[in-house]
């Protein structure tokens, strides 16, 4: 998200300096799957990065949603909505590589790798940063700072109001090979232990995201591959046949965070601003939109407003939209991770209504694809 903002702002700002704590090539082999919406694709097209990614992405042509042990299912299909795709799967390493290549072509944008910001002192009109590299400590002065892509913990001088909501759930992610090829279909299966998402990913494998109660996910991670795949098949059903192999499993706790920056000349974007449950797949795409909206404000209003006013206006404009996205995600979590009497039946009716009502389908797809 930070790289996207820098590329988008290359003509609005003078010199842009990016500080990255990791090594230059540290993300190249990172195969974590990212789900990009059509709105994010448009942003990547605008910054001339999409062409580099087209041969590396996997298109989602259909989305099949159902729940275990009850009626109700829906199928979303690109042919219904005149869309090339309902979303795209790309590896984190491929996305970062393409963004880094583009940044290295821009004269006024520079990246310093293996450089950690340890202090950010607000001494108006400037911000004074303390940087730690491998060999020494440096100072850097700026009138405007963007926090993006990562934790802000441990940066002295930052005043943040952070709200955290714990779901008492975790996620386990891996790649799995199924008996039946994915055919560019993504699956969302709601079970009594939490949602299972299977996302088509390159060589006929699926990227799996399985969320559920902490203890359940912990137990899944302890299983050997054969038992894990058997449990997955039992929970997911037969739509893609049996599961034949899986890669290394990674798990992490799920929480929703919202960070309010208390400085008038500092903005947080991406997961430095908010994190959310993966059930709706909106976390990264919201970060893309944050970066786009802020760069748009700089481009359109920097000549008529002072920087402090512009930043405040941007923050206010994003408050209501962020609340809607976080609220929508939380609603999905509560609605589809609840097995109380009546909920399963209500979910079945909701999925059936979504499947048979074209206007509701269109509205849902617009929201998930473009955030509208």
Describe every region a protein language model picked out:
Residues 2-3:
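N-terminal Rossmann-fold NAD(P) dinucleotide-binding loop
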Residues 37-41, 92-96, 100, 169, ...:
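A general structural signal for well-ordered alpha-helical segments in protein cores
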Residues 216-304:
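FAD/FMN-dependent oxidoreductases across multiple families
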Residues 137-139, 144-241, 245, 249:
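Conserved FAD-binding catalytic core of PHBH/FMO-like flavoproteins
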Residues 296-372:
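C-terminal helical "tail/cap" subdomain of flavin- and related membrane-associated enzymes
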Residues 8-32:
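Glycine-rich FAD pyrophosphate-binding loop
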Residues 42-46, 52, 56-158, 165-171:
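Conserved N-terminal helical subregion
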């Amino acid at each position: 998200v930070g790289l996207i903002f820098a590329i988008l702002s290359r003509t609005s700002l003078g010199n842009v300096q990016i500080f990255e704590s990791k090594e230059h090539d540290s993300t190249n082999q990172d195969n974590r799957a990212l789900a990009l919406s059509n709105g994010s694709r448009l942003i990547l097209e605008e910054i001339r990065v999409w062409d580099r990614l087209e041969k590396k992405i996997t298109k989602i042509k259909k989305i099949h949603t159902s729940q275990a042990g009850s009626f109700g299912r829906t199928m979303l299909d690109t042919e219904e909505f005149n869309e090339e795709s309902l979303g795209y799967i790309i590896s984190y390493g491929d996305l970062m590589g393409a963004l880094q290549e583009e940044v290295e072509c821009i004269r006024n944008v520079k990246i310093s790798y293996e450089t950690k910001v340890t202090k950010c002192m607000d001494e108006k009109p400037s911000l004074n940063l303390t940087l730690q590299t491998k060999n020494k400590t440096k100072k850097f002065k700026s009138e405007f700072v963007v926090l993006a892509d990562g934790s802000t913990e441990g940066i002295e001088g930052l005043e943040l109001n952070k709200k955290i909501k714990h779901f008492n759930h975790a996620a386990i992610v891996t790649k799995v090979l199924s008996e039946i090829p994915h055919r560019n279909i993504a699956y969302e299966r709601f079970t009594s232990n939490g949602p299972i998402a299977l996302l088509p990913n390159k060589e006929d494998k699926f990227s799996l995201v399985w969320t559920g109660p902490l203890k359940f996910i912990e137990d899944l991670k302890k299983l050997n591959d054969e038992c894990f795949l058997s449990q997955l098949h039992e929970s997911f059903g037969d739509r893609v046949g049996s599961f034949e192999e899986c890669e290394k499993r990674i798990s992490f706790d799920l929480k929703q965070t919202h960070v309010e920056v208390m400085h008038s000349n500092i903005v947080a974007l991406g997961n430095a601003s908010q994190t959310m449950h993966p059930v709706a797949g909106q976390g990264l795409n919201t970060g893309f939109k944050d970066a786009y909206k802020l760069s748009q404000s700089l481009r359109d209003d920097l000549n008529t407003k002072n920087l402090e006013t512009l930043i405040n206006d941007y923050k206010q404009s994003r408050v209501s939209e962020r609340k809607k996205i976080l609220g929508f995600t939380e609603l999905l979590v509560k609605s589809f991770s609840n097995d109380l009497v009546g909920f399963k039946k209500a979910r079945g009716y909701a999925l059936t209504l979504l499947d048979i009502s074209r206007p509701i389908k269109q509205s849902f797809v617009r929201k998930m694809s473009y955030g509208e």
